[in-house]
A protein has these predicted regions:
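An alpha-helical, amphipathic repeat domain used for nucleic-acid recognition
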Residues: 1-103
Length: 103
């Protein structure tokens, strides 16, 4: 897999594009820890590790959003989408909170 572009979102958060398509958002520390830079190649093992990190972050974010106030499934999806989580990861986070009966 080829990292085509890294676009800053905030001072510490970046959008990572792999093979021309948005893959996920990572923090500056994660980019340096996994040696991710524009025009670099990442292996499947690193990609899978990054996906696991983002899935865990999405689940924690969903749980945090529900501690502040009750939200509908649609509201929760919208907030996760605003947080730059990919659709398939949002689905995993939604399944996670549904498994506890929170949504």
């Amino acid at each position: 897999m080829y990292v085509t572009k890294i676009e800053p979102v905030t001072k510490t958060k970046y959008k990572v594009f792999i093979d021309g398509q948005f893959a996920f958002a990572l923090y500056k520390g994660e980019l340096s820890r996994y040696h991710i830079a524009e025009e670099s190649v990442i292996g499947d093992d690193i990609y899978d590790s990054l996906r696991l990190i983002v899935v865990k972050r999405a689940k924690l974010r969903a749980m945090h959003l529900l501690t502040d106030m009750d939200r509908t499934e649609s509201q929760l999806r919208t907030k996760l989408k605003q947080g730059l989580y990919p659709d398939d990861i949002i689905e995993q986070a939604m399944a996670y909170v549904k498994s506890f009966g929170y949504v």
